[in-house]
């Protein structure tokens, strides 16, 4: 294989190369190539037109950063064998292969588990070495390798914050990725940060919180997600009673399988085989087809999404009471009464209630630890002057009522 096959031009990091041929062959596999057809930020491009980047570019970028992180740890004298190095690269490359179309928005439409569980099943289908799976699932003896793949300060987050900031144009996501990785060290097989890196970690935590509210939980994006879920809910309801009519309104048979049979368990091999053939294009093709459907509710919802008429979001700091919800439902029903939609249909497909919440830092997960020259280890909540325990523990909650 020529070297040119191992070089990729990334818009964030420039020309990047990978040291193992096995990595190249994994990239060429259908499971990784599928990620080209799944956008990293789902429907966020309805708000940020530049957010067209994919899970594929993120996975490659994360793998590149992993080579930098592992090389840095090796230069500091930490023992990472070639087999461990290669296995860790494979784990980060494949970490998102279990994502559904439109990523987190539709995660539980297909399977009753998280995408990480599907990623692990795909690793097994690819006959990955046991070290790859052990590192991914946190059962490998050197725990810092898993922490680089998945933790509160992992390579995944370092890449997606940088990449999402670049493509959305939201500068709050810019972090000192290079600086943070240079501060990585290992203590008792755990990933730690040299004390000089504390300010970069503070910036990282604050940037992630800001990106959540400005991008990931932007109210228009959440509203678009609600609309897409309503479309698929209506399609499922029609499929169950044999009224989706795929003969006259053809859609992907793999998508129809899930609409007809509902959410599946991850041990369903047939469902997994159909799932890995699905991507964003299957959903968009269905939405375009349904915009002409004879079912008025389905066609109205589908056409609304196609034309970016995603409805209104009403956000408040406390939960909606039953009385408030009823009042909004009645008002919405009056709006559509002339179109013949029933009150029950309005509640089921045209109105969605939910909660948006975000915490800058979780004390339930492994902590970000700072390593001082005197050998002392402190959690970031103890070491930081800016991020005390009260700030880090505070969970911001917003409750919404979305109407089409």
Model feature map: region roles:
Residues 1-87, 101, 105-404:
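Histidine-centered, transition-metal-coordinating active-site segments
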Residues 94, 98-99:
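Short active-site segment of divalent metal-dependent hydrolases/proteases
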Residues 90-91:
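Alpha-helical scaffold segments that flank or form the walls of functional sites
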């Amino acid at each position: 294989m020529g070297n040119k096959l191992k070089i990729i031009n990334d818009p964030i990091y420039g020309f990047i190369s990978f040291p193992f041929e096995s990595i190249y062959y994994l990239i060429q596999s259908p499971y990784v190539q599928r990620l080209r057809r799944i956008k990293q930020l789902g429907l966020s491009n309805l708000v940020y037109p530049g957010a067209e980047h994919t899970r594929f570019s993120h996975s490659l970028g994360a793998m590149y950063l992993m080579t930098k992180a592992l090389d840095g740890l090796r230069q500091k004298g930490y023992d990472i064998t070639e087999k461990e190095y290669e296995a860790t690269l494979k784990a980060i490359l494949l970490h998102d292969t279990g994502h559904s179309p439109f990523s987190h928005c539709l995660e539980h439409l297909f399977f009753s588990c998280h995408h990480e569980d599907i990623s692990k099943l795909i690793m097994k289908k690819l006959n990955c070495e046991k070290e790859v799976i052990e590192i991914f699932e946190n059962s490998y003896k050197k725990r810092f390798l898993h922490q680089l793949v998945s933790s509160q300060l992992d390579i995944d987050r370092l890449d997606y914050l940088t990449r999402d900031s670049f493509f959305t144009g939201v500068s709050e996501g810019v972090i000192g990725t290079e600086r943070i990785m240079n501060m990585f060290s290992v203590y008792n097989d755990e990933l730690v940060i040299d004390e000089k890196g504390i300010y970069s970690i503070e910036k990282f935590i604050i940037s992630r919180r800001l990106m959540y509210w400005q991008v990931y939980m932007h109210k228009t994006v959440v509203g678009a997600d609600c609309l897409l879920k309503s479309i698929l809910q209506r399609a499922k309801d029609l499929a169950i009673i044999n009224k989706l009519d795929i003969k006259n309104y053809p859609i992907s048979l793999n998508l129809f399988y899930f609409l007809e049979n509902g959410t599946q368990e991850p041990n369903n091999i047939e469902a997994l085989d159909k799932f890995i053939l699905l991507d964003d294009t299957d959903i968009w093709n269905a939405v375009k087809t349904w915009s002409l459907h004879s079912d008025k509710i389905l066609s109205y919802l589908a056409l609304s999404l196609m034309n970016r008429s995603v409805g209104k979001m009403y956000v408040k700091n406390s939960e909606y009471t039953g009385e408030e919800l009823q009042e909004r439902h009645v008002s919405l029903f009056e709006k559509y009464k002339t179109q013949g939609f029933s009150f029950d249909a309005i509640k089921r497909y045209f109105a969605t209630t939910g909660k948006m919440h975000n915490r800058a830092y979780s004390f339930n997960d492994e902590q970000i630890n700072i390593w001082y020259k005197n050998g002392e280890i402190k959690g970031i909540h103890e070491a930081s002057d800016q991020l005390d325990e009260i700030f880090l523990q505070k969970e911001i909650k917003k409750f919404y009522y979305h109407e089409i």
